[in-house]
Design a protein with these regions (language model features):
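Non-heme di-metal
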Residues: 1-326
Length: 326
């Protein structure tokens, strides 16, 4: 990760935020991928902040959600500075061993904490941004302590060789897995496309909050689908990953790097068809011969996505109806 020590100008601030944003996008995805490679409830540790026994998988998911909110804060700040935040990411990596993933997570947090806390921002020049950076940095300090405790507990109980769930080698030959992976890709894209528009329209409280609600729904669907894949004997895929001889997966493009829409109308025009595409895929999925608990979860996703179709149709119609809305 690039080191940025002197931040004196607006250009310096933008560069700092862009470097940080690429990190935050990556880990908001990577930590959840690591979490769903762990068995639920198996890797317990004493959390140094929560002060109680905690499931490493559950807390790693929560840390990933923290990072998504960091990305949103950074992106909105960049948008207010007149800069397209972008969706480029640092490299996303998954190791076969749980301990290796957790060590990577802790190392990554240490690197980004150094980025935030060692950046010497010109005193008084950008006080709100400086305050945000320090606030985010102490979330990362907490994450370092939590990942460290996870590593110690996992290796004390299971040694260094505790393996995570591997990708299912038959996923390309199983229609159910292909369909759920396809849904996961669409949910990941939908979540980030909505976040792009939340950042674009951050000054429009009504629109941005409606879009943010849908983004959170898609994030939850992606999270639940990742759990369903484990239930069906697979793990969430890392898009565009290359796997080496040791089974380590790496990707620099775990999600689309660009999304359409440059103003309110052109952005809103993209969303009804996105939601209808998801509805069609969910309707296909609930018709499969799957365990009832899986189908029940998919039906919940389908119902909420139908609500999104209704909402996005009306948001688009209203944007077309009212003159002067930009």
């Amino acid at each position: 990760m690039e080191k940025i020590r002197q931040v004196k100008t607006e250009e310096d601030v933008i560069h700092l935020l862009q470097v940080a944003l690429e990190h935050e996008w990556a880990v908001s995805f990577e930590y959840v991928v690591h979490a769903y490679s762990m068995p639920k409830g198996r890797f317990l540790y004493e959390d140094p902040v929560l002060k109680q026994a905690t499931d490493a998988r559950a807390q790693t998911i929560q840390i990933g959600i923290d990072e998504m909110y960091h990305a949103l804060q950074l992106g909105i700040t960049l948008a207010r500075l007149g800069v397209d935040p972008g969706f480029g990411t640092d490299e996303v990596v998954r190791h076969p061993l749980v301990g290796d993933n957790l060590r990577r997570d802790k190392m990554t947090e240490e690197m980004v904490t150094d980025l935030y806390q060692s950046a010497e921002i010109e005193p008084g020049a950008f006080p709100e941004i400086e305050n945000m950076v320090w606030n985010i940095s102490f979330d990362e300090v907490r994450h370092i302590a939590q990942f460290g405790a996870m590593i110690d507990a996992v290796e004390a109980a299971f040694g260094a060789g505790a393996a995570g769930y591997p990708p299912n080698p038959d996923r390309e030959h199983r229609g159910d897995l292909r369909l759920l992976h396809g849904l996961n890709r669409l949910e990941n894209e939908a979540m980030h496309r909505y976040l792009k528009y939340v950042m674009m329209f951050n000054a429009h409280q009504d629109l941005s909050q409606r879009l943010f609600k849908n983004s959170v729904n898609h994030m939850r669907h992606w999270d639940k689908l990742s759990g369903l894949l484990v239930r069906l004997g697979d793990v969430v895929a890392i898009e565009n990953a290359v796997t080496d001889a040791a089974g380590v997966e790496r990707s620099r493009l775990p999600m689309p790097a660009a999304y359409p829409g440059g103003n309110r109308l052109s952005a809103l025009e993209t969303l009804p068809d996105l939601e209808r595409g998801l509805v069609a895929k969910y309707e296909e999925a609930v018709a499969l011969d799957l365990p009832e608990e899986v189908r029940a979860q998919l039906r919940l996703h389908l119902a909420l996505t139908r609500e999104h179709v209704f909402t996005q149709d009306k948001l688009l119609a209203n944007a077309r109806r009212i003159k002067g809305v930009v």
